[in-house]
Amino acid sequence: MKLLFRLLKYAKPYTILFIIAIAIVLSLTFVTLLPPQIVRTAINQYITNENLPLNERFNGIFKMAIYFLLSTSAIFVLEYFSIFLTTYIGGKIVYDIRNDLFKHVLRLPMSFFDKHPSGQITTRIANDTQNVMEFFTSVITSIINDVFLLAGVIFMMLKVSTSLFVNISFVFPILIAAILIFRYFDLKAYRAVRTNISRVNAYLAEHIAGMPIVKLFNAEDFERKGFDKVNKNLYKSRIQQMYVFAIFRPTVSTLYRLAIAAIVWMGAKYIASKSLNFGDLYAFVAYLDLFMRPLEDLSEKYDIIQNTTASAEKIFTLMDESEEHYGDEKGETEIKEGVVEFKNVWFRYTEDRWILKDINVKFQPGELVAIVGETGAGKTSIMNLINGMYRPQKGGILIDNLELEKYNIHELRKQISAVPQDVVLFSGTLLDNVRLFHDEINEEEVKKALEKVYVWDMIERLPEKLYTKIIERGKGISAGERQLIALARSVLFDAKIFILDEATSNIDVQTEERIQNAVRELSRDKTVIMIAHRLATVVNADRIVVVHNGEIVEEGTHKELMQKKGVYYKLYEIQFAK
């Protein structure tokens, strides 16, 4: 219940609209009770009353028909406004929740994303919030409507004939029990279907994304069997759900018809004894139909409340994740020179293994420094620490002799440009992807940045040039072209510190040489750190830092390190061995 109350806090800005919606629902409840009463009056006073002249009977029936038409029209209008208003309120609340949730996700540390798959986070923001919407659109006002309608129906039944109500009251527990049993098994089957749908979706998402590997290794038959397995489980759960529906729905309907038969049989006895009129019997049967609706509705709403509670738990679990609190919001906002220094830095992603051990290194402006080492040595982790994506467990990182914690981390990142190994492009235009949706940057500035990394000639040949559409993560654009666009981003934002993580690994030799020249130009007044696996790209670096098993084991120029014949020498020999 705490979760539901927490959800209701989001309804507070819409309190007046909720009050109006509840007033409409209560009016709807009252008007819904009128049609059986109108027909009852028509039957008792005009249709079966032979004491009235024929023209008076016709006039009375016509008058009742007008009342019936007005009441059904009122029901239509009230239902329209009720549905419209609750859907509007629910949509606004879910809009607010989604916005809050996504804003919170943007402020989460990278360590959170290392532990949680992106599909799970997407489900929380997109699907679970949609489940919550149903709570606001159909549960709150519907429960009020159902409770008052049940009370109203029972009151009207007692008003029509207390004796008949008492005599047939045994059918109510039977109907209620049948509906509850049906709902229990239906919910169980429904949840099994939902679970299997999620598994099918997850299988498709993972294996369609990996389709190049599937085709490359001729794994189509294996994939077909794998999908058939999860698809068959979904099919079986669907059949189980249909079986439950096929058994229980007719059972409930049959019990309802038997209840009507019992009312008609007992009502006939009352009519024969002159203690009940035909109109009273009709009204009683009509009110039984109205009695069934809120019963089924309430049991259905219970299912929705359970689903909402489960979704709310997932939403608030994500919302309660600790935000990134690295740095000082009121701290330093400007990198003046760009001197980066690691002092006795120890870092790990998980408790069981240190990635970096006692790192001591300094990067100066005007100097091109390359970091090399085997795969998994800890090179990329150094970049992540400079960006403030992670916090070291021991030691400190200083920029311009000021600890990273004393900077405003968001302002700091604006002044550090990084080209990662895995370049992400967003849906939109090439222009948007280079300037990263900073509309204040004009096309001419973007063009100059692209020229500096020698990619403008390629873009100029495209039919729509900078307005070429990029689809889903840059599909259709080669890995090399993506890296060039990422380089252009870094050049455009003119940062003090410039980090390239394997940034030329997918580029041809000629373009790579041009990029090296561009990087050399950048290093004249900036701190440039180049993380590289291919040693041919770093031979002209001012200084090379060699990382081995998380430790810095060597430093120097290419020539100096080759003369030492240490780790760097061995790596070089392996790469260039004939």
Residue ranges of model-derived segments:
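Transmembrane helices of ABC transporter permease
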Residues: 13, 17-30, 71, 141-192, ...
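An intracellular "coupling" helix at the cytosolic face of ABC transporter transmembrane type-1 domains
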Residues: 110-111, 127-136, 140, 148, ...
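Cytosolic ends of transmembrane helices, especially the final helix of ABC transmembrane type-1 domains
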Residues: 219, 243, 260, 290-318
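Transmembrane helix-loop-helix hairpins at lipid-water interfaces of multipass membrane proteins
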Residues: 18-78, 158-163, 261, 272-278
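Hydrophobic alpha-helical segments in the permease module
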Residues: 68-75, 79, 172-179, 245-259, ...
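Membrane-integrated ABC transporters
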Residues: 1-32, 47-67, 82-86, 90, ...
